[in-house]
Amino acid sequence: MSHDSDDKTFPYQKDDAELRRRLTPMQYEVTQHAATERAFTGEYTDTEDAGIYKCVVCSTPLFESGAKFHSGCGWPSYFKPLNGEVIDEKVDYSHGMVRVEVRCNNCGAHLGHVFEDGPRDKTGLRYCINSAALNFESRPENE
């Protein structure tokens, strides 16, 4: 699934040639063509350090480490984004399923999907995000 047919215009317009130079092939395929990295292979799947997860394309802060949890699905999982403005959600009918795709609301980069099987004592949501779509910025817990 590519975002080429999507009508939404995002604030950050990215140059494809520059992205191909700057991103790894996996980062490019995940963020620009909605590919999915293999389960349990992502750099941030088991990261427990305090910090902020940012969009690999435009550096928009997306998730805090305090919202991360171990879901056992093989991808980094969060029960909420940093705030309600950073994520764009779109119904995804690919692969014979109906899911909700999660994209960066600044640049449109594909991040992953959101499911309603997250921690019930939090939001009940599980944002299942590809590590390849993220950069992690370590921060002390109290910041």
Swiss-Prot record:
Residues 16-139 form the MsrB domain. GO terms for cellular component: cytoplasm. InterPro entries: Met_Sox_Rdtase_MsrB (IPR028427), Met_Sox_Rdtase_MsrB_dom (IPR002579), Mss4-like_sf (IPR011057). Its cofactor is Zn(2+). Zn(2+) binds at residues 55, 58, 104, 107. Binds 1 zinc ion per subunit. The zinc ion is important for the structural integrity of the protein. The lineage of its organism: Bacteria, Pseudomonadati, Pseudomonadota, Betaproteobacteria, Burkholderiales. Belongs to the MsrB Met sulfoxide reductase family. GO terms for biological process: protein repair; response to oxidative stress. Its EC number is 1.8.4.12. It catalyses: L-methionyl-[protein] + [thioredoxin]-disulfide + H2O = L-methionyl-(R)-S-oxide-[protein] + [thioredoxin]-dithiol. One of its GO terms (molecular function) is peptide-methionine (R)-S-oxide reductase activity. This is Peptide methionine sulfoxide reductase MsrB. Gene3D superfamilies: Peptide methionine sulfoxide reductase. NCBIfam families: peptide-methionine (R)-S-oxide reductase MsrB. Transmembrane segments: none annotated. Keywords: Metal-binding, Oxidoreductase, Zinc. The active site is at residue 128.
